[in-house]
């Protein structure tokens, strides 16, 4: 077993080297510098990789270097780059570049942004598209909020691999671990919750069983994809539709809209069923089609809670009316 790593923050870097010394590992295996612009392990491949990159941190200071490498068809960022305000998905591409051909595994902790930020055709969406269509995303586990010292936001563990077990091929497992916690007796910064060893084991077993239940959902890769289709409507002038020189209708750019059509749907059939009845004169400009991917995690675990009955609400109001000494009755009678 050989442990290696890289850290940008000098303080954290020093702590890591000290920990390596205490553990009997070689502290020289820990390097100082940015993984994005100063890769100390260029060309090296690893079996297992774990990281918790900074949440929502700008990479503008390294933009020139990253943009240049993204032009290289063999570079780490060849698929695309996210917006410069959040470099999370750059770190994931960095790790994927270090996967062994015979199979590697990655565990990376993100906030919610990499799951859905960016519309079809954007850098973020193209990166998700590449990862999912190449069947590398194995599982996403949502964690409770308030488990980090310096932030109370919800976080997610992505498990990425280039060698899935046969039953997981073409599938993505989502695990809702947001309720797997116990409150701490004393807060530590923003950290007010912790995951017990029993709860950790329960999450691990949920992952290994690979079954659908209240906390686990399994989807085909294609489920997360959509085609963003541009919908046009004719330009009307003096009560008449305007045509172009080629005889085709001229679109009204002010009425231009788009539809996200799931990849599991036939685009033409969806358009006829969902759009045409409401916009009978509309048409699709298929030359502008863009395929995107997103994971709307909360939506998949949403559980409908029925509204209280009118009788229950009335009963409560009458009880309040009694307590308020007839004020409610006076208002209603008026």
Task: Give short role names for the model-derived ranges.
Residues 43-329:
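A conserved structural/catalytic subdomain of Rossmann-like adenosyl-cofactor enzymes
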């Amino acid at each position: 077993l050989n442990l290696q790593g890289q850290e940008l923050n000098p303080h954290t870097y020093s702590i890591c080297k000290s920990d390596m010394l205490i553990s009997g590992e070689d502290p020289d295996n820990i390097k100082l510098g940015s993984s994005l612009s100063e890769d100390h392990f260029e060309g090296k491949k690893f079996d297992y990789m774990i990281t918790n990159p900074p949440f929502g941190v700008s990479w503008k200071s390294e933009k020139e270097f990253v943009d240049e490498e993204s032009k290289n068809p063999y570079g780490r960022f060849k698929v695309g780059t996210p917006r410069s305000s959040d470099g999370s998905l750059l770190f994931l591409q960095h790790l994927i570049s270090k996967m062994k051909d015979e199979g590697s595994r990655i565990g990376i902790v993100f906030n919610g942004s990499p799951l859905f930020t960016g519309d079809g055709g954007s850098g973020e969406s193209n990166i998700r598209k590449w990862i999912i269509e190449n069947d590398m995303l194995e599982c996403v586990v949502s964690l409770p909020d308030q488990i980090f010292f310096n932030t109370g936001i919800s976080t997610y563990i992505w498990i990425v691999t280039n060698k899935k077990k046969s039953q997981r091929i073409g599938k993505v497992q989502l695990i809702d671990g947001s309720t797997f916690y116990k409150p701490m007796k004393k807060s530590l910064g923003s950290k007010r919750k912790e995951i017990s060893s029993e709860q950790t084991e329960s999450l691990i077993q949920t992952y290994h069983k690979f079954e659908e239940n209240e906390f686990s959902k399994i989807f085909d890769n294609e489920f997360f994809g959509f085609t963003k289709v541009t919908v046009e409507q004719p330009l009307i002038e003096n009560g008449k539709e305007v045509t172009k020189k080629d005889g085709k209708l001229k679109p009204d750019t002010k009425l231009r809209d788009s539809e996200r059509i799931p990849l599991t749907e036939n685009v033409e059939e969806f358009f006829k069923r969902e759009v045409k009845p409401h916009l009978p004169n509309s048409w699709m400009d298929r030359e502008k089609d863009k395929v995107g991917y997103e994971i709307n995690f909360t939506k998949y675990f949403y559980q409908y809670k029925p509204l209280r009955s009118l009788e229950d609400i009335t009963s409560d109001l009458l009880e309040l009316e009694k307590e308020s000494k007839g004020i409610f009755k006076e208002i209603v009678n008026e």
